[in-house]
Swiss-Prot record:
NCBIfam families linked: dhys
Keywords linked to the UniProt accession: Hypusine biosynthesis, NAD, Transferase
Pathway annotation from the record: Protein modification; eIF5A hypusination
Protein known as: Deoxyhypusine synthase
Family of the protein in this entry: Belongs to the deoxyhypusine synthase family.
Positions that bind spermidine: 139-140, 262, 309, 335-337, 344-350
Function: Catalyzes the NAD-dependent oxidative cleavage of spermidine and the subsequent transfer of the butylamine moiety of spermidine to the epsilon-amino group of a specific lysine residue of the eIF-5A precursor protein to form the intermediate deoxyhypusine residue.
GO annotations of cellular component type: cytoplasm
Catalytic reaction equation(s): [eIF5A protein]-L-lysine + spermidine = [eIF5A protein]-deoxyhypusine + propane-1,3-diamine
Length: 379
């Protein structure tokens, strides 16, 4: 291609040197942390996350997650005294003003990990209003009160571990003896719960099983079972203990999908023909009612699957959550619930169209301690 006039051919100029439109005033400049500046050293967690928010990629999503959590926690509505009687439900702060009802969900592996202590901090300090966990998220909390979990390697061969009676959760190791200790601990409690159930039905009649929402009655639900376990463990390192102390319900719609399910199964043989009964219908009414009564609803979801959808579906009952923060590594391309972005939940009415929402694509054990340090624990 000849060039006798010293100019670029128009095709090159148009393709490579295309002019940009003026940059809008509200565009945010990409900047990172300059550690050569004194103010960038020994930063507080909140300042670190604020600085990361302009980095781009998941650092910016992390910053947005913290902003949303700060907003869901700081929102206040009307004072209780200004509300009609039927509106005096939901969550209120210590001064009597409406606040966001925060639903937190987490998967069992996060309790197996060292994130348990972070989650316990939130429950101990009444920073969430309801929890949805998988069965492992219940039993692993109790088991850690009875025996330790250890660091291992992702690459440890399963056959050798099985021969040694060691169970692997990622790069964590749980001796099988821990589950034996769990069985020894829980079976007498199940025996007592069955006895209380049978005595109650005998004294009240079978009608007592119908629509029984008495928190203290031995007409058991998964959340009542978990509350009882928190009471019985009586250990301040336990999430369940603090949930019991602070009257924070822990819902577990798949309570049989784990070691607890094994224990309940074994118990049917021991107690036969009597059986301990768990009413899941009362629990779905309870969590859905909490959502319907909330002045505003916020979701903090760590992981995916059942715990994510159970909270989102509860928020459908109020035409969607007002705030949503997802932290997981799931991708949406297989159509999984875990991988779905918040906008998919908007299409179902589970998150409001004008809600503040974000998904952080990251391992929750890396990200959530930073989130808590910059939000809940920064006061």
């Amino acid at each position: 291609m000849s060039n006798i006039d010293g100019k670029l051919p128009d095709i090159l100029s148009d393709a490579v040197l295309k002019q940009s439109v003026p940059v809008p005033d509200n565009f945010v400049k990409v900047e990172g942390i300059d550690y050569s500046k004194p103010e960038s050293r020994n930063m507080r967690s909140k300042d670190l996350i604020k600085s990361m928010a302009t980095m781009g990629f998941q650092a910016s999503s992390l910053g947005k997650a913290c902003d949303i959590i700060d907003e869901m926690r700081s929102w206040r509505g009307e004072h209780r005294d200004k509300l009609e009687e039927h509106d005096r439900k939901g969550s209120f702060d210590n001064d009597g003003y409406q606040k966001t009802t925060i639903f937190m969900g987490y998967t069992s592996n996060l309790i197996s990990s060292g994130l348990r202590e972070t989650l316990r901090f939130l429950v101990q300090n009444k920073m969430v209003d309801a929890i949805v966990a998988t069965a492992g998220g219940v039993e692993e909390d109790i088991i850690k009160c009875l025996a330790d979990t250890y660091l291992g390697e992702f690459s440890l061969p399963g056959k050798g571990l099985r021969d040694q009676g060691m169970n692997r959760i990622g790069n964590l190791l749980v001796p099988n003896d821990n589950y034996c200790k769990f069985e020894e601990w829980i079976v007498p409690i199940l025996d007592k719960m069955l006895e209380e159930q049978e005595n109650y039905v005998e004294s009240q009649g079978k009608d007592c099983l119908d629509s029984n929402f008495d928190q203290d009655s031995p007409v058991w639900t998964p959340s009542k079972l978990i509350r009882r376990l928190g009471k019985e463990i009586n250990d301040e390192s336990s999430v369940l203990y603090w949930a019991y102390k602070n009257d924070i319900p822990i819902f577990c719609p798949a309570v049989t999908d784990g070691s607890i399910g094994d224990m309940l199964f074994f118990h049917t043989f021991k107690a036969s023909p009597k059986q301990l009964r768990l009413d899941i219908v009362s629990d779905i009414r309870k969590i859905n009612s909490m959502s319907m009564e909330a002045s505003r609803a916020g979701m903090i979801i760590l992981g995916g699957g059942l715990i994510k959808h159970h909270i989102a579906n509860a928020c459908l009952m109020r035409n969607g959550a007002d705030y949503a923060v997802y932290i997981n590594t799931g991708q949406e391309f297989d159509g999984s619930d875990a991988g779905a972005r918040p906008d998919e939940a908007v299409s179902w009415g589970k998150i409001k169209a004008d809600a503040k929402s974000v998904k952080v694509y990251a391992d929750a054990t890396v990200v959530f301690p930073l989130v808590v340090a910059a939000t809940f624990a920064s006061e």
